[in-house]
Amino acid sequence: MVSLKDSHFDLFHLPARFALDEPTLDAAYRAVQSQVHPDRFAAAGDAQKRIAMQWATRANEAYQTLRDPLKRATYLLHLRGVDVGAENNTAMEPAFLMQQMEWRERIEDAAGAKNVDALDALLAELRDERRARLAKLGALLDSGSDQGAAEAVRQLMFVERVSAEIGAQIERLEH
């Protein structure tokens, strides 16, 4: 029997690894939700309703974490005792720092020129960058290179943040 303290992977009876089959995760989530959804306990006592609500909340949190590759990687590292350190560890390899500066300059230039096409192109480039970095992250996690994976997570967080900024710039320029 799974307890509230078990891992997200245990909750859905999935192996604790980065590569997940999304349809399998979705089916496991629906199976758990069908068992613990508060509507099933509408006629139950207050204690049972409260427990059902805890389980439903736990299932939702676990599902949201596992379906997002970046959150899943961070969670896997947490299970391994590795803190990604996104708040206080901003150390990045020099090549990535140079890439960051280039992206920032391109965003600034395109936004200054009100060039939505250039921003769209950069956003597409960052999507490709994200895909490649997720593949690298998976390989690092699979090989047990947890510190390398933690740095890859921090880099991906930056890529996602910049992508969101570009999306916001495009939105502003189009309206």
Curated annotation (Swiss-Prot):
* Domain annotation J: ranges: 7-79
Gene Ontology BP annotations: [2Fe-2S] cluster assembly; protein complex oligomerization; protein folding
The UniProt keywords, alphabetically, are:
Chaperone
Q: Which SMART domains match?
A: DnaJ
**Chaperone among the record's keywords?**
yes
Q: Which GO terms describe its cellular component?
A: iron-sulfur cluster transfer complex
Q: Which GO terms describe its molecular function?
A: ATPase activator activity; protein-folding chaperone binding
Checking InterPro entries in the record gives: DnaJ_domain, HscB, HscB_C_sf, HscB_oligo_C, J_dom_sf
Signal peptide (UniProt feature, chain positions)? none
**HAMAP family per UniProt:** HscB
Q: What role does it play?
A: Co-chaperone involved in the maturation of iron-sulfur cluster-containing proteins. Seems to help targeting proteins to be folded toward HscA.
Give the family this protein belongs to, as stated in its UniProt record: Belongs to the HscB family.
Subunit (UniProt): Interacts with HscA and stimulates its ATPase activity.
NCBIfam families membership: hscB (TIGR00714), PRK03578.1 (NF002935)
* Protein name in the entry: Co-chaperone protein HscB homolog
Native source species: Burkholderia mallei (strain ATCC 23344)
